[in-house]
Swiss-Prot record:
Belongs to the UPF0342 family. This is UPF0342 protein Bsph_0375. SUPFAM superfamilies: YheA/YmcA-like. InterPro entries: Com_YlbF, YheA/YmcA-like_dom_sf. Disulfide bonds: none annotated. It comes from Lysinibacillus sphaericus (strain C3-41). HAMAP family: UPF0342 (MF_01526).
């Protein structure tokens, strides 16, 4: 019997060695070492999470919440360190998407003859 978890753990170790992961790791450290950037990012994440919770609960987002979120987003975009971190995260996300596409390929193959 195949133990897929051994392979996944090996993949996780390899994933940590990719240039994309290492770039994100370095970018996160840069943000963490800058108190202002860190506070701006923490506030932005807090707002994002609060708005997502409200949306998932089916609650309507208030205009002032959206304006506040937009202002927080602008602060994030204006901070070069945070922008670099988010750009590194997006590059890493592309790697994750590609891995996911490869993992899903066998499932897609199962359904090809059904169409």
């Amino acid at each position: 019997m195949v133990n897929i978890y051994n392979d996944i753990n090996a993949l996780e170790a390899t994933f940590r060695k990719t240039p994309e992961f290492e770039a994100l790791q370095a970018a996160v450290e840069v943000v963490k070492s800058d108190e202002e950037a860190l506070n701006v990012f923490k506030n932005f994440r807090k707002i994002q999470i609060e708005l997502q919770k409200k949306q998932l609960a089916g609650e309507e987002l208030l205009e002032d919440e959206l304006v506040y979120a937009q202002k927080a987003s602008q602060l994030v975009q204006q901070n070069e360190k945070i922008s670099a971190m988010l750009e590194a995260e997006m590059k890493l996300s592309k790697v994750i998407e590609e891995v996911n596409r490869i993992l899903i390929k066998p499932i897609q193959g199962l359904y090809e003859d059904i169409q």
